[in-house]
Amino acid sequence: MIAWRLPLCVLLVASVESHLGALGPKNVSQKDAEFERTYADDVNSELVNIYTFNHTVTRNRTEGVRVSVNVLNKQKGAPLLFVVRQKEAVVSFQVPLILRGLYQRKYLYQKVERTLCQPPTKNESEIQFFYVDVSTLSPVNTTYQLRVNRVDNFVLRTGELFTFNTTAAQPQYFKYEFPDGVDSVIVKVTSKKAFPCSVISIQDVLCPVYDLDNNVAFIGMYQTMTKKAAITVQRKDFPSNSFYVVVVVKTEDQACGGSLPFYPFVEDEPVDQGHRQKTLSVLVSQAVTSEAYVGGMLFCLGIFLSFYLLTVLLACWENWRQRKKTLLLAIDRACPESGHARVLADSFPGSAPYEGYNYGSFENGSGSTDGLVESAGSGDLSYSYQDRSFDAVGPRPRLDSMSSVEEDDYDTLTDIDSDKNVIRTKQYLCVADLARKDKRVLRKKYQIYFWNIATIAVFYALPVVQLVITYQTVVNVTGNQDICYYNFLCAHPLGNLSAFNNILSNLGYILLGLLFLLIILQREINHNRALLRNDLYALECGIPKHFGLFYAMGTALMMEGLLSACYHVCPNYTNFQFDTSFMYMIAGLCMLKLYQKRHPDINASAYSAYACLAIVIFFSVLGVVFGKGNTAFWIVFSVIHIISTLLLSTQLYYMGRWKLDSGIFRRILHVLYTDCIRQCSGPLYTDRMVLLVMGNIINWSLAAYGLIMRPNDFASYLLAIGICNLLLYFAFYIIMKLRSGERIKLIPLLCIVCTSVVWGFALFFFFQGLSTWQKTPAESREHNRDCILLDFFDDHDIWHFLSSIAMFGSFLVLLTLDDDLDTVQRDKIYVF
């Protein structure tokens, strides 16, 4: 039994010895080596070369050491393994070095250089040894070159530009130490050429240093780069008061927007990329101090609080002017020979005290007309209106019942439906024709705009805030600064926020939106007081005063500021809709307010208006997710855009007196036959037709542009549609106002001029394009620029300042545009 086992044991021992002989080298060559000297040696599976280096390390001076290796034999298998053993660290790498790219592509590098991580010393001076071991499993000799150099410019200095070269297999890193009194610096890296793509990383002074393409993202902060990169570094994030600036060239350029290189279709065959070298320059400069933060915040508050001060001064002046006017009227009433009468509803012969807040006509046509024209003829009615008698406008029953003011009652008139058709389809309409409903009912109807948008704001803003906080947390934890598209050359961090200045500059939207709400509140209080006094101007003159839409506009402006600030916490492609959602709201509400001025009875309800805006936001989300280069999406959207334009045009042209049912096509053919074929006649409502034709031309053109060009920024394209329609309607309104013989008073005229100028400057700064998520993060950083205001705010921050002021001014224009009609009877105010 034992006899046959003995030869088996001998055979097993011999086999193990033969394998050990193959795996373990028989010779070890150890030699003392020197810096700045090139060693050309051979190595094989039976030989290990060990090089011993020593150098003096001092506590107050940091010196870099760089190992350069070049393998002269181009062989596919059995690479050389280099192991650098230091006091507190070990670095190993193989040559040829193989790095992986996208889709597991392999790239081969024959020449490799690595900078050694320097362990600290507590002694004043210390001699440290390190060893370079060279081994391989190749049975044949492999020739290599080894050189160890000192890096003289290893420590970067504040304000000094340093230029160097690097490749994917020859990464570079340098050390920076915070000077006394400096709490924050900005590391700027530039290059004259965009490619090859590179990565800039900021890492703590620890060993090992992650300086290869496949591990540079493991620790610290990093961002890809073409021509420009910048990272703001704070002392509080680095306990050692120092950090490494690591620069790595990537194996491929796709991360920076470049194309993939040609790759042979050979399985597991690495590609020799040759010489992908990049020349870069690094500059470390001091970032802004805490005084700049305080100055920026005070500047921002000062600008917008000055509007509050100006508003208070104007309110005081207006109050003084009204008191003076009241005093003069009292003197006139005391003097019978003056011939002026008190302009109150109960001062007209035969007129009853005010009841029910109805408007649109006078209870006693003859008496009230004479009194009003006489009292107002001296000033505000000096320009011409068509002289029409009010006798034809007989008294109407008041709708004063308090039984119900539900939404179902909004369209309730005391007239029969046929009378509604007769009134609203007249060729020439006045505001009195479309201001016949109960004022209390309309007041509640338009208040719903405010309460709905307040509810929408809460439910929309809370998840947005939560999401952007998560974005910022991910950026801070992972260090990946490619997630957010900042202007890194002017991004000032505060706490966990990476770009506090971009958030602070949105304060204007909130403060000016609040100021607008206060102005509307004051106007509403004054109007209600006038109603309680039975002031005839408030009861029967001017554009009917409904403030619900104004409250909604002010709330939307405040929410735009909040959501824009949320977007700028981490601006990128996926959350840009946060910045634009309430812009759609503002554009829609402004158009509704313009329409409501002359059509108070037939304006859209809050539910239908917000439902339409919700559909717009829904398409905005679809465009962000599916619209990029998707032809089918653009076809569907363009068709819906054109159909919606036609339906809205029909609704506006016929003042809502049409029906979308199964007989619509028959009625269309009938109109075409009677008005175009049988008898060619012009449109009944020429002014409305001109506006709608222009609107259709613009919207069809925008739809064609979107279908042909398919812009990547769908949210901005959708916003452009809304803004173009708003500007068209606003211009039409002003032109028709002047064409109707009305005038624009001084304050709204100043608001129009100043707002137009501010919008012009705002758009100039908006189109500077400091970053764009339509490109890769590295390409976006090519557009980054330094701060231009107080060394704290950039061009986009100035856009925030100016656009908030311009929006506030635009709201004031809408508020005051028809102040000249406050003493004009409503059946002398044209509808257009």
From Swiss-Prot:
Q: How is it modified after translation?
A: Glycosylated.
Primary residence:
membrane
Please describe what happens when the gene is knocked out: Knockout mice demonstrate a statistically significant departure from Mendel's law, but there is no significant differences in their weights or appearance as compared to wild-type controls as newborns. At 5 weeks of age, male mice show reduced weight and size as compared to control animals. This phenotype is not observed in females. Mutant animals exhibit increased fasting glucose levels and impaired glucose tolerance, probably due to impaired insulin granule exocytosis by pancreatic islet cells.
Keyword annotations from UniProtKB, A to Z: Cell membrane, DNA-binding, Glycoprotein, Lysosome, Membrane, Phosphoprotein, RNA-binding, Signal, Transmembrane, Transmembrane helix, Transport
Topology feature Cytoplasmic, residues = 315-447, 521-546, 627-631, 710-715, 768-796
Disulfide-bond pairs as recorded: none
Carbohydrate-modified residues are N27, N54, N60, N123, N141, N165, N476, N496, N572, N603
Q: Which of the residues bear the PTM Phosphoserine?
A: S401, S403, S404
A GO biological process held by the record: glucose homeostasis
This entry's Gene Ontology molecular function terms read: AP-1 adaptor complex binding; AP-2 adaptor complex binding; DNA binding; double-stranded RNA binding; nucleic acid transmembrane transporter activity
Q: What is the effect of changing Y410S?
A: Drastically decreased lysosomal localization. Decreased interaction with AP-1 and AP-2 complexes
Similarity field: Belongs to the SID1 family.
Can you name this protein? SID1 transmembrane family member 2
GN (gene name): Sidt2
